[in-house]
C-alpha cells in the first residue's frame, strides 16, 4: 500500500494536466489590470532577423549568412537577412514605437560574431559600442533590456574550426563570450537568456537540416551532404546544456554579487493534446512533451534527461555524469517559454516512420497533427504549422507548474503570422483583427493560468514588434504588429494590433474590433511619422 501511495503521488501531476479539463477561456476584453503588479509586457526580436548590416561594424560571418548564400533554395523566397528591417541603423525610431505602445521591455539578441568576428580572440569594439548604444537608448526611454546571448547565429569561424555545437570545444568558447557580454553590459542588463530554442537548433539544424548549418542524413543524405540525423541532435543539445550551465555559473562566480542580474533560457514548447482518450495516446502526448520541453527542462530541474528519452534513445543519448549533474541541475533563475500553437498527439504503433527516416524526430514514437477527424484544432494563421489554440497556453503553464515545481516563467515569444503577398494591399494588411483576437485570447488564458491556477508567469513578449525576415519563410509571412513597407524605405506603419496593445497597456480594456482602435486612413497618414530619419 505504501508503494502504491508513492506511485499515486508521482503520477498525480501528470493525471491533473492530461486528464482534468481546464476551462477554455475567451474574453471580449483584456487589460493590464488582468495581470499581477509588475507583470512585464514586451516585444521580442533576434539579431539576424532584425539588425541587417551584416557587413558593417567589422561583424564576422555567422552560419546563417553562409546558409542563405550557399543554400538559398531552403529559403522559401530565396531571400536573406543582409538588410532585413535594418534595426542596426533605426533602433532609436523602433524604441520610440515601443515607448508609444507602453511596452515595459524589449527582448533582443546579441550577435556573437559582432562581439567576436572569429568566434574567439580579440573583442570587436564596434560591436560592443553598438549594443551599448542600443541598451542605453532603451533605458533612456524606460524600457528594460532582456538580452539573449544566442539566437541561432553561431560564428561561421567556429563551424569551420571544429563543427560548432558538435564539439565540446564550443562550451569554453561560449562561456568566454558570455563572460565578455556580462562584463560589458551587465551593469545595465538584469535579465539574460543564454539560448533561444535549443530544441529547434538541434532538430532543424541537425536532424531535418532545414536550418543552419543544414546537417542531416535523411534518405541517405538526399537533402544534406553531411550529418547523422539519429545522433547529432543529441550531441548538440547536450553541448548547449553544458554551455548554458557554464555561462550560468560564470555569472554566479564573477558578476552576481555586484550586478544582481538573473539568468534564464528560452525553450520552444508546443502543447500536445492526446488524439483520443485511450491510454496509449495519453502516453504519447506525455512523450511528446518529454522529447520537446522535457529534453531541456528535466536536466535543469532534475539533473537528468527524461526517462522516456533514456529508454527510447538508449546509447545515442549522451550521459549526464555526476559532475555534470551538479553543474546543470538548478542552473537557472527563470525559464523562458516560446509558445505558439498546440498539436494532437497519438501513439505511433507501427514505427514505420522511424524505420524509414532513422532520425531523432521519430524516436519519441509519436505522430502529431493539427487535425482530428478532419477538423482543425484551431483556425490557421499564415503558416501551415501555426493553428490558433489559445487554451493550449494555459494547459502548458499548468503542466510546467505541476511537473517542474512552478518555476518563474516568462512567455518570451507568442504571436501569429499572416501571409505576405503582392496581391494583399496595405489597407487589408493593416486591419489585422485576427492578430488582435489571437493575443486577446492567449492573454486571457494566460491570465487564468496565473489567477486561477497559480502559475508563476511573470511576463509576456509579443513576437514581434515588426514584420521581419522569418528564417525559412523569408519575407513571405508577417508576424509584426507594425507593418514594414519593404518597397518604401522600410517604413514602419502601425497595424490595428499595435493600437490595440497601446490601449490595453495604457490600462484600458479593449475590444477586438480594429475599427474602434485606429482608422486605416489615419495609419496611412502616419507613414511619414514613422519613416526613418538619419541621425
UniProtKB/Swiss-Prot annotation:
It catalyses: Hydrolysis of terminal, non-reducing beta-D-glucosyl residues with release of beta-D-glucose. Its EC number is 3.2.1.21. Disulfide bonds join 216-224. Glycans are attached at residues 118, 445, 489. A beta-D-glucoside binds at residues 49, 151, 196-197, 340, 413, 463, 470-471, 479. Keywords: Disulfide bond, Glycoprotein, Glycosidase, Hydrolase, Signal. One of its GO terms (molecular function) is beta-glucosidase activity. The keyword Magnesium does not apply. Residues 1-27 form the signal peptide. Belongs to the glycosyl hydrolase 1 family. PANTHER family: GLYCOSYL HYDROLASE, LP05116P. This is Putative beta-glucosidase 41. The gene is BGLU41.
